[in-house]
From Swiss-Prot:
One of its GO terms (molecular function) is GTP binding. Allosterically activated by GTP. Uracil binds at I204, G209, D210, A211. This is Uracil phosphoribosyltransferase. GO terms for biological process: UMP salvage; uracil salvage. Transmembrane segments: none annotated. InterPro entries: PRibTrfase_dom, PRTase-like, Upp_A, Ura_phspho_trans. Belongs to the UPRTase family.
Amino acid sequence: MIKDERWEKVYSFDDSPYLMEILTELRNKDTDSIAFRKGLVKLGRYMGYEIIKTMDVEKIKIETPLEETEGIIVKDRKNVVIVTVLRAAVPLMEGLVKVFEHARIGIVSASRGKAPKFEIEMNYVKIPQITPEDTVIVADPMIATGSTLITVMEEIKKYGTPKRLIVLGILAAPEGINRIKEKFPEAEIFVTQIDRGLNSKGYILPGLGDAGDRAFGAPIKIPTLPQVHTID
């Protein structure tokens, strides 16, 4: 894990050959949806382990079948709220809950509109109560403009103030990180890798495309048929 010196509390994993290999597969346009989803699950699980390394531990005494010895517990691991941004973050959440099995889960459906406005539409929110002992992990694979995450994090604040607010993603653009840190300087950002920037449509470059479409298939738009009213 590498601390990026451009910002406070921003970390990437360029130093991990294992994660870089998974990311390479995700970037490849020929990777199918099954492999793509599995890759996201793996990254969520591994990055969850890395987050645990930053949590407080407490030494305890236990009895083995042979004698007394000393061990540890990670106290904060049981006070985690994972907020998933539908739909692309679902595999990330699957990986995270393998590490934080006691986590409470929040679900937010939020999507970004087209350039140049990039307006955010949020139409479903289910978030549990958040306490001052909680670590909130907001999972969203792509931190592009940061607009979606800022909207979600503003919503999260209505449910309480956590001990830690963590954003977990796969790829990030500097533009998105800048906007998040301006609005939420206390936020910690963990991403597999930070890419060079955005194109005119707000996509990360070199990126990996639309994570939701690649994980679950591109949605189709069904035309709305006119309603026919009959008169008895």
